[in-house]
Structure formats: structure tokens, C-alpha cells
UniProtKB/Swiss-Prot annotation:
This is DNA-directed RNA polymerase subunit beta. GO terms for cellular component: DNA-directed RNA polymerase complex. The keyword Cell membrane does not apply. Belongs to the RNA polymerase beta chain family. DNA-dependent RNA polymerase catalyzes the transcription of DNA into RNA using the four ribonucleoside triphosphates as substrates. The keyword Transferase applies. GO terms for biological process: DNA-templated transcription. Its EC number is 2.7.7.6. Pfam families: RNA_pol_Rpb2_1, RNA_pol_Rpb2_2, RNA_pol_Rpb2_3, RNA_pol_Rpb2_45, RNA_pol_Rpb2_6, RNA_pol_Rpb2_7. The gene is rpoB. GO terms for molecular function: DNA binding; DNA-directed RNA polymerase activity; ribonucleoside binding. The lineage of its organism: Bacteria, Bacillati, Actinomycetota, Actinomycetes, Micrococcales. Keywords: DNA-directed RNA polymerase, Nucleotidyltransferase, Transcription, Transferase.
Amino acid sequence: MSLFGVGFLASAKGKRVCAIGRSSLGKISDPLEVPNLLDLQLDSFDWLIGGPRWRVALDAYRKNPSGAPIAEKSGLDEVFDEISPIEDSAGNMQLNFSKPVLEAEELSVRECRVRGRTYSAPLYVEAEFMNHDTGEIKTQTVFMGDFPLMTDKGTFVINGTERVVVSQLVRSPGVYFERTPEKNSEKDLFSGRIIPARGAWLEFEVDRHDQLGVRVDRKRRQPVIFFLRAIGMTDDEIRDAFGEFESISVQHEKNIGLSRDDALREIYRRVRPGEQASAEAGRALLENFYFTSRRFDLARVGRYKVNRKLGVDVDPTRMVLTRSDIIATIRYLAALHLGFSEVAVLNSNKSVPISTDDIDHLGNRRIRPVGELVQNQLRAGLARMERVVRERMTTQDIEAIIPQTLINVMPIVAALKEFYGTSQLSQFMDQNNPLAGLTHKRRLSALGPGGLSRERAGVEVRDVNPSHYGRMCPIETPEGPNIGLIGSLACYSRVNSFGFIETPYRRVVNGKVTDDIEYMTATQEDEHAIAQASTPLRPDNSFVDERVLVRRKGGEVEVVPADQVDYMDVSGRQMVSVATSLIPFLEHNDANRALMGSNMQRQAVPLLVTESPLVGTGMERYVAIDAGDVLIAEDPGIVGDVSADVVTVKQDDGKHRDYHVGKFVRSNQGNCYNQRVVVRSGDRVEKGTVLADGPCTDKGELSLGRNLLVAFMPWEGYNFEDAIIISQNLVKDDTLSSIHIEEHEVSTRDTKLGSEEITRDLPNVSMDYIKDLDERGIIRIGAEVGPGDILVGKVTPKGETELSAEERLLRAIFNEKSMEVRDTSLKVPHGQQGTVIDVKLFDAVDGEDKLGAGINQRVVVYIAHKRKITEGDKLAGRHGNKGVISKILPVEDMPFMADGTPVDIILNPLGVPARMNFGQVLETHLGWISKQGWKIEGDPDWAKDIRVREAQPDSRVSSPVFDGISEGEITGLFSSVFPNRDGERAVGSDGKAILYDGRTGEPFPEPISVGYMYVLKLHHLVDDKIHARSTGPYSMITQQPLGGKAQFGGQRFGEMEVWALEAYGAAHALQELLTIKSDDVVGRVKVYDAIVKGYPIPTPGVPESFKVIVKEMQSLCINIEVVSDGEDDVSADAETLQIEEGLDTSPKVEVGSLEEV
């Protein structure tokens, strides 16, 4: 693993090599390869630490400066330069930092995962202490803490778990102008605000009386003339700059005698009311607010935005406000108020166009990627350290000071730890499958510190904006309260050094499309006419049509002559994200269902046997390889030794390289992460060749599900309302089986009464329970375990009980000091079972494993369980078509085709028209065609655009997004499918076949749509959800059972369920449910007693909730007395308390079944 976290991913991906030959049925040939899908994460972190990727980009920019300028300094250099120098209050001493360096990492990624450590490298920086009084300089290399590193998959390993830092979408610093309608009049109000990356806002606004005012640091409004005077403008300068604008000149004439000091005092009085105002205080206030780099920072992007919007020519490295910025902002706002279309730039012969800003436009929102987020956190940690350094400068002996004694690295370490461990943007990685992980790393979140909150975000900010085209996916977003606030980067987009998202276009010159690729931000794109990727072209790349459909600013569409087209999209999949681009026939689906399809692919569980889809989109290989779960050859060579966990390649340069294969590792979501070697000893491999498949990949392609033979038909009502019927074959053949691994952990600690101990010697436990424990008391690998079985024997010291005289005598004679212990063993939780596949023991004594304070040993046990498909599991297609399995039919009962082939799965045809996801039907048809193979005879009219004239049975095809095969072509291909041995084609040109009832052998009355659909098994498994309880915990307040599986709670019997039993008159069942099974405290204790002793169930008592009603009525001054037949007061609490006290010895154990009782 390389230090910079960009190992083989960076090098091996010149070209993604895939073993499956997938035939494309698209018409467009993409001129641009899909970029590395992890670049967003890898490039940003590489800039932070000054790695090789950033250096290469910087060198390239220096040779050919085009596009956004690349940062001249690395993120670490920037932040240490900002804080230097740290001076004491008298200015006699200063401390400078320079040359931050990351040394080699202590542990590899694999070791960090196993040992529960953080993958990091020590950060060193050169610190120089200078004493101005003596001229003495002391230099030292100082350790600044361990700096977490990014792995080559774009993740961080923090305390042994993989985490992802999500990029944040925030409002860019800059200057913004807006028009808001006035509620009580027909006039519009105009405002302009300068928003920095760090510091106070400066706002200007025109009120309903056409007067221009200013707000300093969002305080009270005051006339703009005061501010102009306060920044030192004379009467003549004000007349020259603003003479043409009445809203300012009127103010100026009124305050002609106003001095600068008076203006400063007035501003101070408005900003700090109640404090003593003086000209000097006002000058210091404005200086600190807007003209000091320590307090105000526009950032590179803010300066770029201000210069571009206002047309000013300020040095791009100047991060504070200048007088020309302020004058240009006021002139722009005054011109906007007067309705001008452009405004002249002062002291220059150019002018800038005037427009208000759409804050949701991606030209005004930027990405804060991982490098910048970590840099901001480091900056906060250094600021805390700076205060410590200043304090130590004043307290320590000047002669003895060296840099090391001044610096305390704890604030820096704490700041980074806090960010990676608890920040809203540092998230537990979604490792459900490779697509889930890849999408997580490409996610863009508007939430988090400095962003929006989901409660206050309106519809506008969540909505799709025309500027999202090619930058942010309009489809993929969550369905819940975060809809629109969390998005995903589009396939081809990239983030420039300012943080704006760019998307590529092909340049069009004189109506001819060239292969020159140009990346543009949303603001640059607004100035051009852009044609779509599917526009027909001649062989010489000129447009077929004289007039071409183009996009303009604001998403407006118009038809223009071909020679007026400036650019053209590079690909049909350019506007969508990776997950959405994996949906074939996306163009035939409703957007709501496409959203569900995108999200559900991320929930697909890795199956026991992977199979790539018959019908794909061509994106499968990019996803599988860029996600990093496929093992790839870094250099060409010959495969040497091959074993299950290591592949050795003898490279052409003579070196031997070992590739480690991951075997049965638990992912964050409890799935089985397993890699399978696909090469053999002696094979020739090139750079980028797949050596081993990962979970959900098949020969280097993403494979989330299985190709199943599907029939669209109702069957005895079992597939009513999205329910699904499947064949018993899928269970028997493990077609949809998956392996799940659970992790169970136990630690021994030092307690007040002594140390806990891992042992086989447990009190009051029979040999049957410990037969699978080894001599240490830890379960053996390979043991089959079920609920309640002991995994690790552990005893904890118990407090001494009062000893009898005899025991005291025996202890005195035999000097026996053994205290009593209680059994605190680790057991298998309810509802879990499986085979122990691994055990890890960490010992604090070794020194290698840092376990934390007070922990002596830690044992981790991994249990694997194979889950076959069963009723209640959730299946889905890629088109948002989802359902729950309602029945598993014997294969002999399933409908079958004329040749005897039974279908695998029966779907309800009514699930298609209302959902408007017809892509699933076209996928089914094309799936059948590619399974059978085809050969196009002659040159029929429908086949003129199909490049693949012949395909063998079981071949893989791709129908790219927005460039897919048409309905007419599918109909034609049905007639070209290879016939069976009888010379017949089972499925007609309409995609339908005669099916026969498996029970009777009779044909169904109508032909039925049959074909192959790619079906995913989702993570919503019934085994994780099903739950039952006999006894368990109760709520302290209501005395009713707790809710939820996690709390081992009961099932809620709600209002509607009560109505149902009332309707049937089931009085006794209802009484039992509302009393002894719920909150009749006395009754339930008696019932438990009766069950244990075998007595009849006693009659129920009074539930607690009834007593609450009585108290409620008494509080309303209605005296209620509840009496039984024997005139006894039933509602008294005395009896309840008495019985509860007497029966307090009742067992507190959770009983699993009546047999246990």
C-alpha cells in the first residue's frame, strides 16, 4: 500500500480490462472513457498531503495553463503557512512552521482492520523559534501527531472500521445580488452581499424609498454614505464613482460636511450599541472585519467569483476586501436597481452584464471535498494550539525555550479524532456491495457543519436545477426527509480546484463535431448552445439535420442552425450517476421508479454464486474495477504460484509481486466479503487484467443479482399487490443464497473487586454447554452454534457475602482467598445461529495491541450463516420493481414452456402500467433474445443501426442509457433468434409464449410475456425482522412490554387489532391481551407461576392503564370507586405492591420456549 493512498487504483486504470465480451447495442461511440470514479476522493486527499497526483497536475498546469488554476501549495503547507508566525504579545519571540512531512505508516491497512487501530502516518513539521532580543534561532523537527491516511479505495480506517468522508455541497464565497418582491407595494427590493469563506458579511440593500443602505456584520442598517466616508473616500471620489446614481448622490448632498471620524463613530455606535464610540474604535472595527487576513478570508474561490462578477482586476492572491471591491459592488447594485443591462467598471474601458443570482445554481454552489474538510479541522486544531503556545511563551524561561517545549499536539490530535469519529460528514462506510461503497464515496451532501439543516431546507434548494445537467444526478437521491439534500456526482463530472463541478463537452466547429474535449463549469456553460449526445451525425462528424436541438442558459431548449452549435454532450449517460447508469432502458422508466431502482441496487446482498446480467448498460466493468473490490494486475507478467489467499506474478521486469486475496471477511453491513482467484498458474496477464473477482463481481463486471426466467401473469392471487412467487429450484440450487457474518466481541477489564477472567471453569454450567470451548474458554473454529450458546467463557468477581463461622475457620486454615464469581460469558444472541469461522484474541500484555484503559484482553468471534431465499424476503429488479416473496412453489407446480422449461419467478402484470416502468418489460424481452442468441439474415430495414449481426446463446449485451435498442429492433431480433432443436421459436415476435399450468398440464388461455430479468436479493431479510417473545423487559412507566426486536420487546396490539377481535366477539382472547399479556402486573406474575407449576391460568386482574384512567378522572374532581362482586375496592394499589414485594424473587431470565419453562 502506498503512503499516499493511491496504490494500484491510480496506476492500473489506464484501460479497464474485462474478461466478459459484452456486445453494445448503442448507436453512439463515446469519445471519452469514463474517468476513475474515485478521483473526487483520491485527488482531494492527495492535494492535502502534497502527493504525486497533485504534483503531476500542477506541473501539467504550469506547462499549459487552461481551466481553473491548480493550487500552488499543498493543503498542509497552506495551513502551516497561515498560522506562522506565532508571536508573543510584546513581539519579542516568534515561532514559525514549515515543511510538513508524513513519514511511513506504522501498520498496513490490513493490520489496522484486524487490530482495531487507525491507519495513519506520523506528521512531522520543522519548527523555528526566534528570539528577537538576542537574535537567537532554534530549529527542531517536531512531531505533530498521527495523521489518518486514505487507503487506495478512498476510505479511512478509524479504530479498525472503514469510514468515508462525504463531500459537502455549500454556498460558494463571493458576491451575490438578489431581487425580492415587496409585500405591501409593487416595488421590488434589491440587495447585494459579499459573503466570505471566513469572517463578517457585508450587505448593501435598496429600500422601498430608493435609499441605498449598508449592514455591517448583519447588524442595523445605516446609510451607505457613512460607510464610504469611513473607508476614506473624499467628496470628489464619491461624486466620480456614484454621480450617475441618484440613490447615493442624494445621501451625499445631505451629508456633505460629514467627516471620516464622525462616520467611523456612527458606524461603531450602530454595530456595538451601548459601548463608548470613538473614531479609533470604529477604524479598528472595520479593519478587523474586512481588511485583516486573520479575521476575513474570501478564499481563492471567493476572490475569483468577486473578480468575475464585478469585473474588477484585483490580485487573485489577495483574500481581503479592497476599496475597489466595495465601490464596484455598490455601483452594480445601484445599476441593478435602475434596471440597467450592464454597468461600466470604474477606471477601465470594459463593462459587465447585470443579472441577479440564483443561489441554487451550481455556479454558486461548490464542493468541499475531503481534503478541504480535513484541512479546516486541522486549522481549528492549530488555532487551539496557538493559544497554548502564546501562553507558554509568557510563562517559560526564555533561555530554556525550544520549539518542542512550546508545542502541545493534543489539540490537533483531538480535532482530527473528533472529525473522523463524530462529524456528520465522516460516515460508517456502506459496504453492502461494491456499488454501495462507490456511491457512498461519490455522494454530495448539503447537510453538515456550515451547510443546511433538513428542517429548514425548502423546496427550491432540494429541486432539480438545470445547472445539475452532467454534474449532479437528477435521479439518485434518498426518498425520505433528505430528498434533494443528498445527491450523487454524475458519471463524467469532476471537481476543479475552486470546488466547482465541471462536465465535459465535445467542441463543435462550423457544424462539425470534433474530438476535442473541454470541461466547463455551470457558469461557463450558460454562454453556449449545446447539442445532445444522441444528435445524428454523418461519418465525417457533421450534423445530419440542418437545424439541431440545443440547450441554452436556464435549461431553455430551442432549435438552431447547425453552424450555431458550440458544443455537444460526450455521452448519453453524462447526466446521470453511476447507479442510475446501470439501469438498462432507463429512458422508458418513470423518474420516481428510476430513483427507487438506483437506491435498491445499493441494497443488493452479495450472493453465493455471482452472475453478470444478460442485459447491462456497459458501465458494469467501470464500477467493479473502480470500486476496488476486484484484484487487478499492476504490471504485465506471468502468473506463478496461486493459492486461495495469495497470487504471485512474475513481472516482465523480473520482479515477483504477491497479491493478497481477501477471504471471508465481514463487511460493515455483516455481509461476506470474499475474493475468488480467476487466473491459473502460467497464465499471461497484462496491466489491468482481473486476477480475482470480489463480492458481487463476475469476471470483472458488477454482478448484483441473478438472471431468472420470469413470467408476467397472476397465479391464484399469490402475487397480488407486488407479491412474488418463486420456484423451489431457487432454494434447492442456492441461486439466491447469501452468506452473512456476525461479529461478537467481549473484553475483560479490571474491576474494583479484581480482574475479570476468560476461562472454561464457569460456575453452575454443565459440560454440555462448554463442550465446544477450548482450554482457554474460547469457542473452537468450526463449531455450530445457536441462540444462547456460550462463545467465550468469562467470569467477573462478585462482592464477598457474609461468611458463616465454619467457612471463616476453613478459610483461616487453608488460607483460601478465592472470591465468588458470576458468569458473564459471551453468548449467541436471540435469533442468531451459524458456524464459527474465526476467533481473534488480543492481549494487552503483548504491547502490540493497544486495547484502551483498563482492558486486559479482547476476544472477537465471527459466526457465518448461509441464508437461503425464503418467504418474506424482498426481491427487486433494476427498475424500481420490488416485492416480497409470498409463496415458494414446488417446481412441478410452476408454469412451464412448450419445451418443458419451468419459469423461475412469477410477477404480477398489474405492477407495470401504473408504475410506468416499462424498462422491465423491454429488459425481459432482450434478456430472452440474448439468452437464446441471434443471427440477422440479409439486411432488413429495422437492423440498419444494429452493429452486432450475430450473437451466440448466453451472450451478454449492453443497452446504454439514453442510447438503447428500440422497440422495433427488439421485435426484429425476436424473428432472428436461434430456433430450438425442433426448429421452433418458443417466444413470438410480441415477446409472448404459450405457458402450461404445472398442476394440470393445460395451457393457459392467453400467451404470456416470458423472458430473463436480472433480479436482486435485497438486504431486507425476513430472518433479521422476525421476532417473538414469551417473557422479557417491561417499561418502568407504563408497565407494558418494550417495543422492537432490539429491546426484545413484544408485538403491539393496537386499536385496529382490538376492533378486529371485537368484531369476532373474541372476549377472552381480548381480555388476555389487554391484561396479563400487557400491564396487569399482579396477573402476569401469577400466570408465570401457574405455567411453571402446571396449574390452570388464573383470571386477569386490573391493568395499570385502567388505574391511570381512574387517576385522570379523579384529577377532574370525579370520584371513581371500582368495586368487585364482593364489594371489595379493586383499584387500591396496596395489594399490588404487597404481591410484587412478595414475588420479587421471580426469575428475571428471558425464557425462549415453554420447554425451557
